[in-house]
């Protein structure tokens, strides 16, 4: 297996994204935060909203070079590598959500199943399988189809305002499968921005 070389543009972009993430998570004073360092309340997009997509982009870009040593050949060893990498990233997300583990009276009934690392794990695992099975020309219609399918799913499955916070299908599916207590509550109502159904376009 040939070893992949370092791609400095990816390393630099990763460093810039991490620096932006640190700035967003630690603005100094939450009472005086520049608007671009806050998430859009729902519709819209700020610089802060791009941090997570940047990380997903980096995962995809890195795969292109990391998989060179496997020659993109779908061998059992390659599948095993993808499986364990996916599981380890997903479990790291659970590890972070569960910490600290020995706090007295820890309430597991409100444990959040999904999050940033879990979303990255799902996106990595599925994308890796697609990359080693299909070439670029085949992937274009697949990616377009996934996005159109997700858009139609939200439109057909939602009620009232299918793209709004309260009545979208993503929220309904997560509540039905996991319950309100296991979802992120930062929007004032139970809604997980890294939930199960919303992993499709990622």
Predicted features, each with a name:
Residues 20-27, 85-89, 169-173:
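An acidic intrinsically disordered interaction segment
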Residues 1-78:
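N-terminal signal-anchor module of multipass membrane proteins
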Residues 49-54, 69-97, 101-104, 109-127, ...:
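Transmembrane alpha-helical segments and their boundary/interface "anchor" motifs
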Residues 16, 40, 114, 120-123, ...:
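Surface-exposed loop/turn and secondary-structure junction residues enriched for glycine/proline
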Residues 14-16, 59, 92, 114, ...:
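Short glycine-rich loop/turn motifs that provide flexible caps or phosphate-binding loops at active sites
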Residues 136-202:
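Long hydrophobic alpha-helical segments that form multi-pass transmembrane helix bundles
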Residues 27-46, 100-113, 162-176, 181-191:
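Membrane-interface interhelical loops and short amphipathic "cap" helices
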